[in-house]
């Protein structure tokens, strides 16, 4: 990887993070874990933004995971990470609201509080339901979900693992493979990318992977000049609309399962038209960061070889 491409990647990601922070001024509130010990990090087996797919009476439904799944034995006590009022209570979940518009949802628990109850910080809310083995923690602000693992939110949390860009594929817009040594016309780029949890969940979820917080790509000519680049995926602070699910996740993506890691396949580039680019050698680089900006990259060499006009 050329050394001068790393600053470009970090500058792009930093700019995206700054822009999001300016648009989301509520991002600075830190809170503890919902299970004991409150002051220690816990294993997570399902990450924010990971691919969720299931079937119901209306057919297939796909959606981004809107919280984090914190591993906890069935029956584990679950506590409020912030004081507030119980604004929603179901047989398997509780949502606590704050006057600021922030809400915290606790799913897959048997509640011990009622709707309208004022709860204190670290007040008992319920216990993990049999067969679930985790509590799903969701944070939202005025109806928009936030990433609990972003800096300054779920605390303490540290991550020193690097995301992995496992492979990169060049395809036609119709999905046919493209030989990277002979690239013509418009192309799509698909990549397998994942992050390793800083704390491995207990078996059978010990192979779990995280979705990266951000995915980025760039196309650099043989002269070292970046001719195209973009941020392709951004789960760093919030979620895209579920209507963009198939724009971001490629077919074959799925969440973590017992004894089986999740498969995170991303559409990094849609319809990159090479016809206006000079023929020659290029480097396509794909990078990913987690919420602590640990960076993993991979690249593939392309040769653009469009036929001469006329």
Language model feature labels by segment:
Residues 77, 103-105, 118, 297-301:
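Well-ordered beta-strand positions in beta-sheet-rich domains
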Residues 14-25:
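Bacterial N-terminal signal peptides
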Residues 26-94, 99, 120-124, 130-135, ...:
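Surface-exposed, glycine-biased beta-strand/turn segments
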Residues 92-97, 103, 113, 300-301:
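Secretory N-termini
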Residues 110-123:
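Acidic, glycine-anchored pre-beta loop/turn
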Residues 102-110, 147:
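A short macromolecule-binding patch
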Residues 158, 163, 173-308:
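Long, low-complexity serine/threonine/glycine- and acidic-rich segments characteristic of extracellular
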Residues 2-13:
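Bacterial N-terminal signal peptides that target proteins for export
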């Amino acid at each position: 990887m050329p050394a001068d491409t790393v600053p470009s990647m970090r500058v792009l990601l930093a700019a995206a993070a700054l822009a999001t922070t300016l648009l989301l001024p509520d991002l600075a509130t830190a809170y503890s874990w919902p299970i004991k010990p409150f002051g220690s990090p816990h294993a997570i087996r399902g990450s924010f933004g990971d691919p969720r797919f299931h079937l119901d009476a209306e057919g297939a439904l796909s959606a981004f995971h809107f919280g984090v799944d914190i591993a906890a034995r069935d029956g584990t006590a679950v506590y409020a990470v912030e004081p507030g009022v119980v604004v929603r209570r179901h047989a398997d979940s509780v949502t606590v609201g704050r006057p600021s518009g922030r809400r915290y949802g606790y799913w897959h628990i048997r509640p011990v509080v009622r709707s309208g109850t004022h709860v204190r910080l670290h007040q008992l809310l319920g216990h993990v339901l049999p067969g679930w083995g985790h509590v799903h923690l969701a944070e939202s602000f005025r109806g928009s979900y936030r990433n609990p693992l972003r800096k300054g939110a779920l605390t303490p949390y540290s991550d020193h693992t690097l995301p992995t860009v496992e492979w990169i594929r060049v395809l036609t817009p119709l999905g046919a493979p493209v030989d990277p040594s002979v690239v013509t016309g418009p192309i799509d780029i698909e990549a397998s990318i994942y992050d390793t949890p800083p704390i491995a969940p207990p078996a059978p979820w010990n192979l779990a992977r995280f979705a990266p917080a951000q995915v980025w790509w760039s196309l650099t000519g043989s002269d070292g000049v970046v001719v195209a680049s973009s941020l392709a995926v951004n789960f760093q602070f919030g979620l895209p609309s579920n209507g963009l699910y198939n724009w971001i996740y490629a077919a074959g993506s799925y969440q973590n399962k017992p004894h089986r890691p999740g498969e995170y396949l991303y559409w990094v580039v849609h319809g990159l038209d090479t016809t206006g680019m000079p023929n020659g050698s290029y480097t396509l680089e794909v990078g990913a960061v987690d919420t602590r900006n640990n960076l993993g990259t991979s690249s593939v060499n392309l040769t653009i070889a469009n036929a001469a006009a006329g």
